[in-house]
């Protein structure tokens, strides 16, 4: 009889943070909104706060970067470690060190689903429908997958059953789709800059932006709009029709997450052939089931916010059962290892984090070492063949561990 590998137990979990309101600004990392000055990601982008003039020019003005990066590390009894990053900062550290640790330490490194279920159920009374708590649980879950892969010597995508394609092809999110085309991406997604409080003039301005970019990029390059929860159904419908002559591929996250009836109506009224997408800020499996029932075309969970890889796999199954695509919100290696195993993810998102979108920069720079970026708009599966998620933690970053246990 062949020997069966004896897996170690988890000895300790630790949590650090960097950036956010209580540390240095512009740290980047897991909180990719935490960028320095003159960055496209903070340049007059439409948000739910844009209706207040004091907060319409900059997303950082209303505090989009106050959380900072959470780093969770899990250590096995044999000394091997796994880690992950997300957006939860110092508050996430408290949740990990003072609550979730009891469900992690002492478990076998393969007990990922058990730990995940216990974390979800133990936080129901204060987690609501996602948010900070789910970001934290996601980070723990990803760290556990990283550790498991390193212990058994396999990349995470092979733990999920293996690749269904040889490479991942990407579209780029940023202010310059024309530059993205030159870099080999299949499409470009731009943020909208105006909302319902701007009236029809706002629609005309954003439609003109799409028209200008269509002229620069040509007919065969995808163009999309990211509306970041900033619109209502009427405005979104009018904007979609205003952009239809320029072959807009999809219109994304027009409405706040819980407006399911609004998404159903928007899908009914959108121009024929234009897709409606959402999911970045949905935070539970149940919310994605309801979102799927609206009939939208693509669900876009963030693996660092929706419950981790364990939940992302379940979301992909929901989407597949309805013939929908699941294209995760850009989350680098954490989604790469998942989507290369999903048959309903024919492409993926790469978030441009260079200030003017003119260069390729790893999304979670500088917190991850050896983080891959697309080459000619693609990443081959061989790039993902290192154990775990294949990246290392940059311990030269200003990491703080505010709590212990």
UniProtKB/Swiss-Prot annotation:
It comes from Shigella boydii serotype 4 (strain Sb227). This is L-rhamnonate dehydratase. The record marks 302 as: Increases basicity of active site His. Mg(2+) binds at residues 226, 252, 280. Keywords: Lyase, Magnesium, Metal-binding. Substrate binds at residues 33, 59, 349. Pfam families: MR_MLE_C, MR_MLE_N. Belongs to the mandelate racemase/muconate lactonizing enzyme family. RhamD subfamily. Reaction proceeds via a syn dehydration.
